[in-house]
């Protein structure tokens, strides 16, 4: 490895660790400033009035479910943040790109909601930016060898991989909003009635299950897409992409039709379908390219022998 490449890798590893530290600092700050006081208030209400009494009023229910939603979101962010240095240590640097894209998709709505002038919003933005920069430095340059279909197939697969990882983060935040708004908060029933539908908790639970499956599949596409020699994935990626597309479209179409005020979901659905189609095209091009490269490598010794 040349000196420039070694410096880039060291800088990339440092940026990944810095991003993880910043995101952990944001989690600790948010817990100390928001969740701990809310937890103390809810526990005091439960001790004073009992669980049924504390949850009997509208305000009590909303406080409890708000706290539950915040804890779930922060727990997920904590797990994803800890995963970054673990991948770095375990040699899974190739998976850092999809992980950073996934965290970007999840955190963008939070960063927009929490202004960058606030410390926790700034820490999250800087942490995600450092992770992205570190993952880009560690990825380095792709090998330029091989036939034209193989090169274009690798490029299409990379774009689809990062796009699906990003959208899986958006799906996660959307699902958290759907569950928090429709499943827990009683006040949303009034809004739902005004929009011409009733809150269907079984439906929300089913959409959440669709989301979990779609996110898992899209992350698998990102983590396991390339082989050790950048060869084609022999259909595994294409199969996962099709499954991811089917589940994501089911979830997004159902939510968009049932809850009209999630206006962004139809557009996300279209982008998801396009990315999964791009993933399939990239897989096909890589297979064609690997076949052409194999034929060319076999023909070269025969030409030399002749």
List each model region and its residues.
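Short, Lys/Arg-rich, polar N-terminal cytosolic tail immediately upstream
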Residues: 1-7
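Long, glycine/tryptophan/cysteine-rich extracytoplasmic
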Residues: 39-63, 197
């Amino acid at each position: 490895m040349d000196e420039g490449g070694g410096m880039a890798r060291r800088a990339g590893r440092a940026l990944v660790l810095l991003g993880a530290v910043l995101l952990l600092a944001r989690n600790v700050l948010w817990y100390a400033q928001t969740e701990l006081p809310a937890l103390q208030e809810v526990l005091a209400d439960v001790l004073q009035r009992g669980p049924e009494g504390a949850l009997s009023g509208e305000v009590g229910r909303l406080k409890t479910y708000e706290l539950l939603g915040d804890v779930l979101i922060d727990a997920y962010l904590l797990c994803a943040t800890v995963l970054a240095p673990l991948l770095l240590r375990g040699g899974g640097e190739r998976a850092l790109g999809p992980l950073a894209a996934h965290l970007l998709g999840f955190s963008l709505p939070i960063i927009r909601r929490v202004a960058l002038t606030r410390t926790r919003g700034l820490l999250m933005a800087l942490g995600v930016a450092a992770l992205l920069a570190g993952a880009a430095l560690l990825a380095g340059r792709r090998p330029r060898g091989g036939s034209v279909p193989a090169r274009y197939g690798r490029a299409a697969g990379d774009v689809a991989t990062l796009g699906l990882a990003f959208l899986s983060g958006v799906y996660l935040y959307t699902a958290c909003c759907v569950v928090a708004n429709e499943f827990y908060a009683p006040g949303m029933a009034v809004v739902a009635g005004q929009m011409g539908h009733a809150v269907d908790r079984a439906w929300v639970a089913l959409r959440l299950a669709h989301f979990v499956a779609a996110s898992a599949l899209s992350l698998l596409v990102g983590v396991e897409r390339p082989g050790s020699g950048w060869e084609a994935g022999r259909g595994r990626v294409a199969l996962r992409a099709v499954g991811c597309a089917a589940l994501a479209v089911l979830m997004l179409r159902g939510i968009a039709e049932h809850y009209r005020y999630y206006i962004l979901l139809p557009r996300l659905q279209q982008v998801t379908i396009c990315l999964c189609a791009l993933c399939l095209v990239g897989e096909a091009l890589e297979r064609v390219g690997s076949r052409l490269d194999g034929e060319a490598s076999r023909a070269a010794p025969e030409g030399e022998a002749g």
